[in-house]
Amino acid sequence: MPSFVLWTFHLCSQWFQGLTDLLPHIPDTQTVNNFASQTGLLYPGGMKYSKIASWVCIPLLTCRGVDATNSADGGSELQLNESPFSKNWQVLGPFEIGTRESSWGADPLEAYGGFQTLQYDPKASFDSSLALNGLANWSMASTHVNSTANPPETILDINLSPDNLTSLQEVYGWDAKQYQAWARGTLTVSKSNSVVALYTDRIWEYRIDNKSYFGGDFFGFRRAPLLLDLSPGTHTVDLRVVRDVRALGAVGEPFINVTLIAQELSKTLIVDKKSILVADVVENRLISPHASVTLHNTMGNPVDVAARFSLKMLNNNVKLEEAQSRAIGFTIEAKDKINVPSSVSLYFEYTTPDDSSVQRTQTMTITFTRRKLPEVQQNTFMLPGGVVSYATMRPPTSLECNKDKSAKLPVLLGLHGAGQAASDEIIRTMLDGVSDICAWTLFPSGVTPWSGDDWHTWGFADLQHSVRALNDYIKYSGWTGVGLIDGDWIIAGHSNGGQGTWYTISHYPDKIIAAAPVAGYTSIENYVPYSMWHNTDSLLASTFYRARQDFKHEILVDNFAGIPVYQQHGASDDNVVVYHSRLMHRLLQESGSPSKYHEVPGKNHWYTGIMTSDFLKDFYRTYVQRPNATDLLPQRFSVTLPPAGHMGTRGGIYVDQSHTPDRVGSIEVERGMANDGVWKLKTRNIRRFHLETSAIRSHVPLYIQIDGSRFTVTPSNSTTTWYTQDAAGKWTSGGDSWRTISQRYGRQAGVNAFLRTEAPFTVTAAAQETRDLALQTCRNLFQYLSADCIISYAVPTANSTTATSPAGNNVVILLGAQPNGYTAGDSAISISARSLDIKTSQGTTSYPFEPGLGAIFIRPLVNERLELVIWGSDMAGLQQAARLVPVLTGVGQPDFVVVNKGTPLKGQGSLYAAGFFDSEWKVSAASYVS
């Protein structure tokens, strides 16, 4: 009998932790049960299998241990065409576009009715601020086929360099290398009764036969293709091409290589074998039980994947809607933990609504990578959003580190740059020069090669849980060496990881012992300017600026004063120019906590040994010797909360609420001497905070004096004591009774707070015509964040804001007047029979229904959850609002936005309203409501 029958497969759910044994499919059930009992797989009184079947997998994350840029599966179940796209494409451009502006619309061809209404005419011209004589014309571009790729790739090369680029760049910098255009070609489908899986690297928006699709695959993840049921023949493809410097860089000519793949698939449930994510086997032990794989539903019906045996569980099935892709998570665990086979084979069983018979997918084989203990290893773990992620790591194995087995060592974090995966060899080996370091070396994935959202809300949650997963590693790997201090981090990162280092130490400073940002940029708007954005009202423009300030680390330097910082940057870096590091070095000097700064002559952005230079080796070896550092908090320090921002503790102080999200909140702290025990706090724009004394890296205060009011600190109940300032400026202390649905707090705070979900997202679309948008929303969340998403076509309940189930954040897609199931309650934004209404301190502003009117806004649910409402008076307004679901950094969405028929042309410059909700879910005073 094959060795894999010695294995059991466990169901893994975000909602319950119970594990249930399961064997591979073998027809002779009784023989299997007898064998299992004899070999110890089933213990006396254990489960008897009336049917040995595939396992159900509760939806988790698809984040693979291989480079996600090659996840289109070229297996035998996929019907391939050599080159289904046209050789020649009609191109119209270039036109101006700002940094990450295309999410808002901002398409100049909307002034002519949209590209889809235009026919190729080499004599026609269109006004453009980037083209010669101010006129853009039609041109032709050709494709070539990369037949060595599997599946074959069709590559469309576009180079529409703006006229007089050198002079333009001298004025506007890298923003001058950004432009947009449209391209038209064809796609030929050869087979009937098939589904086309369309992959569109570098494309954010396109049309197929004049039907619009938004999201695409801008970074080339190839995780969630658009699944199309197209008839045989030729189909028109219109691509909106955007050259984004943040994604494509600014070195060399500003060309765009669009990569297209079209696969004709059979109508079934397809296992994407290249998406398999599993932990490594180290010294013959599987170091984590968590695993996942992506399924694509190319059938015309929903698919239920379910267990076929008696099992007590809270959620015993997972559903894929028509044309949906989802990652399916599960656990693998051996009874004989030191006898791991080289591979295991398994499959899924599923049913459809119109056929109760059980069907099965093709078999997939999981082949384990085997490592030795001193090597960098791949570990897997669950995220709160119900997905499986991974990190690579190296335990401290040297004899020097393990002299005292009772010792506990800090975590050394290495954050990768944009477009790289933690499993890439370049990342796995970047700290090999200090492989004997006495720390737990960890390379988080950030969920995706772009670290989710640049190591911010989504990516940082992955970082946090990759650290916590080290405790599980100790359990599963059989580790017997030194322990772990999972609250002491030494962090280093390169490029985007350097920016992630700035983010981490400015937002979660109490976790950091020391930091080394290497060739890191300071913020996205300092990396690529926003000077090409459409002009707009100054109050409206300030709204977008505030929405980006949570990630503008230049204004948050005071948050990490006192933490040792080593900076290194190549003097000849043409990717992230050295100005970024010089600027932060100067700002740290001004804060009174200067960094150590090392500029490497003649070196560019990346070079061999960059992360293990003598300068950085000194950094690592110095600060791994300072675990449990208790002297990092200066006598005087500050807490700076950015406008509409969110952060962890600084000096143990956690700001729960500001008075207004329209400006910075701050607390200046002067610590008294240890025998004095008094901390004096001076606050600005702080409404409520509490102390987490366990996070304080100094003596815990006996008293705190807040703007002159004195309170006794009792460490045992500090986390349940809140200090609150009323409207008159008086400070009081109290319990947690204030935490109700009328208050904004916890996971609801900050921009992109919607991404802080504790379970899979649920997207609800009751109206038939809105279902494609529900699928688009889930596809984009999966494509860009690897997030899991449940689609529901049920009518939202009238009391959805107070419902406690499901546990995650919601998206509700609504169309027309008083949408079925929607209730405004006491919300600041409501939808009546004739208008969209916004309540402010000045009264109620109503926007009567008109073509193109739409809105997107968050509203509170119980238990710190959020609901993202996407609404339109018609489909045009709804589709425009749906573009602003937060999946791409730098777009600058505030808490609410009201779009109109002018938004596709003028983007954010045309909005009726945009702004933020304060701590009581009221529209803030500086919000723009026209």
Curated annotation (Swiss-Prot):
Main location: secreted
InterPro entries: AB_hydrolase_fold, Peptidase_S9_cat, Plant_Biomass_Hydrol_Est
SS bond partners: none
UniProtKB keywords: Glycoprotein, Secreted, Signal
Cellular component, GO annotation: extracellular region
Signal sequence, renumbered to the chain: 1-20
Domain of life: Eukaryota
UniProt-recorded Gene Ontology molecular function terms: serine-type peptidase activity
Protein name (database record): Uncharacterized secreted protein ARB_06907
Organism: Arthroderma benhamiae (strain ATCC MYA-4681 / CBS 112371) (Trichophyton mentagrophytes)
